[in-house]
Amino acid sequence: MEKLLALIVVLVILLSLALFYLCNILWLRAVKIRKKLRRQGIRGPKPTFLYGNTKEIKRIRQELKFSQKQGTNNFISTLFPHFLLCRETYGPVFLYSTGALEILQVSHPDMVKDIGRWTPSELGKPNYLKKSRKALFGGGLFTENGDEWAYQRKIIAPEFFMDKIKGMIQLIEDATVTVLEAWEDMIDDVGGCREIVVDDYLRNLSADVIARACFGSSFTKGEEIFCKLRQLQKVIAQQDSFVGLSALWKYLPTKSNQEIQMLDEQVRLLILDVAKEQHHYQDSHNSLVNAIIDGAQDGRSAAEAEDFIVGNCKTIYFGGHESTAVTAIWCLMLLATHSEAMEVCRGRSTLDVDALRRLKIVTMVIQETLRLYPPASVMMQEALTDVKLGNIEVPRGTIVQVPRLMLHLDKEAWGADADEFRPDRFANGVAAACRAAHMYVPFGHGPRTCIGQNLAMAELKVVLARLLTKFAFSPSPRYRHSPAFRLTIEPGFGLPLMVTKLP
């Protein structure tokens, strides 16, 4: 009897501790953060237990779902209407909740600038992202913080310096020629002009570049990896509404969680096979994968080394091709609807590194596309220690959110025509295009600026220059302008274009 009583006491204590822990992570910690910020005058909508403001956000989205005017480049009111409503109500700095997370949204220029001066050990990637996006990015450069982030960046960043990009230009050209020839054959079959849905072609092209340049293989060889990562992207994007409860949600045996686990394991095995094969050959074109494999041996166990390899390869595979592909897609959409800009862009038939630097108009088109349609809509960081942004003391554990779209469409920074496609605004560089350079952040801001931006820009220049020398583009009658958020901003119903072969 005494043993049974003792067991009951132990179970009650353990249950109490578990309940206290859950209460702390789901409510008390958020309450403490909220109180500290509200004492400093930061306001926001009142949250509810467990759900925060997520129910209200869903309601606002539903009510304003069809408020966007067709054809406009400002789609914030469609995808993120709660951002606009909260900013109008509470100002450029406000607080909202997704349950266990307190999110401080910052679009005030001075505070955005301040964010860039903090190190990744102080203001880093949120822990919830590391958990909720683990299947997509693993423990790679995208999600790591502190010393581990610095170590990974030291290994990977040199592979994307301009001297390395020079050796990738021909790879990009070869991948682009494959698309050119496919489109020419399709058009020749019908004579002169036909509708082509360009999305998959541009995604495959970008995937081919990453596969060749970073992993020494063709897209065909890595096709299964890219397809499964795309499937993961779609499933994970559907779970975003549960982000505040992600720490618990991911443990439930739901259909989507089971699909994520299955795809994650399949991608892991495929990446390890590719890495093992390419490391064996030690090919000069796949120095990145070799650098990752060598870096994984730094005092790690076999399992930790595999996690290191898989996480960073996932980051390169997905991050390296998806953002570039969707930017190329939006570039063609904007050029198709602005024929005068398309004509100005037509240029050389031979490209090298020096020629790329002289493609000023094409560069301006890419910069303007990245302003209007940045692949990632927000920058998310977590205060890993107490930090100060402007006059605001931001307590540890706060998620700091910078809405790229709102910065890029701010009329005070960009002028009254901020919603319009005007590549010439970048004629004299970013500094002259807007009031403050830190209001333009397509590749991030501060020490975590994207390491792959040189490759992305080189690829986009080659692809656009090549396509525009061969084809003219115009909108298809079937095109429906409906940007969608699926971890990246992409056309909701694809991009069908009328493609005409030039003489």
Curated annotation (Swiss-Prot):
One of its GO terms (biological process) is lipid metabolic process. Its cofactor is heme. Residues 1-6 are lumenal. CDD domains: CYP714. It comes from the Eukaryota. Its EC number is 1.14.-.-. It is found in: Membrane. It is a single-pass type III membrane protein. Gene3D superfamilies: Cytochrome P450. Keywords: Heme, Iron, Membrane, Metal-binding, Monooxygenase, Oxidoreductase, Signal-anchor, Transmembrane, Transmembrane helix. GO terms for cellular component: membrane. The keyword Transmembrane helix applies. Coiled coil: none annotated. The chain crosses the membrane at residues 7-27. Residues 28-503 are cytoplasmic. It is an enzyme of class 1 (oxidoreductase). Belongs to the cytochrome P450 family. Probably not involved in gibberellin metabolism since over-expression of CYP714C1 in a heterologous system does not induce semi-dwarfism. This is Cytochrome P450 714C1. The lineage of its organism: Eukaryota, Viridiplantae, Streptophyta, Embryophyta, Tracheophyta.
